[in-house]
């Protein structure tokens, strides 16, 4: 059975004090969540160490939002996978469209990051997704297949999460129809050699649409942006009712 993973991506939000306040409000709200659901918070680097200490032994896992592919070296501003595992981090988001758009990341560099993450014992969450222009041009399938194949070269698919995040739905409120997200995620699954890989949907997931999204047979979780910043809304997503 594929693991259900609900992950929040805080992006560049929350100071350490704000993160601690979030956890105080959030943890009691998910005490009764199904044990089969993995809950992950992917937070800024500055929040990781303090949150790791507060969450130690609990059910919420921590993830980073990026990682470099080299183990060490003259890479100013970068973080290695070993630095993350040392403080108890389990997951790392790789290849998010914002990293691709603003920082020039590619399928090839995403692949290097995935390999480095796995080598260090982290679970990579590889993001793929098409732009509005690509969808309008009928290129969704080709774009997604290319991203998946290039991102997974030599990757161990037993230690992997994929997130389908159509770029046009991220932070716009314009959610991809649940059935269409299910179709594309089914296409992604066809490219894999391991049928048990967890594939999430991301893109304006919120408390109002999560039940319909999670009712789809191919969707194994959600990568949640803005709705993960508030304890009540993210707890409602974790406690979805498909």
UniProtKB/Swiss-Prot annotation:
Q: Which reaction does it catalyse?
A: D-glyceraldehyde 3-phosphate = dihydroxyacetone phosphate
Q: Which InterPro entries match?
A: Aldolase_TIM, TIM_sf, TrioseP_Isoase_bac/euk, Triosephosphate_isomerase, Triosephosphate_isomerase_AS
Primary subcellular site in the record, as a coarse category: cytoplasm
Query: What does the subunit section of this Swiss-Prot or TrEMBL entry state?
Result: Homodimer.
User: Which PROSITE patterns does the entry link to?
Assistant: TIM_1 (PS00171), TIM_2 (PS51440)
Its family remark reads: Belongs to the triosephosphate isomerase family.
State one Pfam family annotation: TIM
- Keywords on record: Cytoplasm, Gluconeogenesis, Glycolysis, Isomerase
Pathway entry: Carbohydrate biosynthesis; gluconeogenesis; Carbohydrate degradation; glycolysis; D-glyceraldehyde 3-phosphate from glycerone phosphate: step 1/1
Q: A Gene Ontology molecular-function term?
A: triose-phosphate isomerase activity
Taxonomic lineage from the root: Bacteria, Bacillati, Cyanobacteriota, Cyanophyceae, Synechococcales
GO BP annotations listed: gluconeogenesis; glyceraldehyde-3-phosphate biosynthetic process; glycerol catabolic process; glycolytic process
Summarizing the function annotation, the protein's role is:
Involved in the gluconeogenesis. Catalyzes stereospecifically the conversion of dihydroxyacetone phosphate (DHAP) to D-glyceraldehyde-3-phosphate (G3P).
CDD domains noted in UniProt: TIM
- The scientific name of the source species is Synechocystis sp. (strain ATCC 27184 / PCC 6803 / Kazusa)
Q: What is the name attached to this protein's record? A: Triosephosphate isomerase
Identify the SUPFAM superfamilies for this entry.
Triosephosphate isomerase (TIM)
Q: Which residues are named in the active-site annotation?
A: 96 (electrophile), 165 (proton acceptor)
Please state where this protein is localized.
Cytoplasm
Q: Which residues bind substrate?
A: 9-11, 171, 204, 225-226
Q: Which is one Gene Ontology cellular component term of this protein?
A: cytosol
Q: What is its EC number?
A: 5.3.1.1
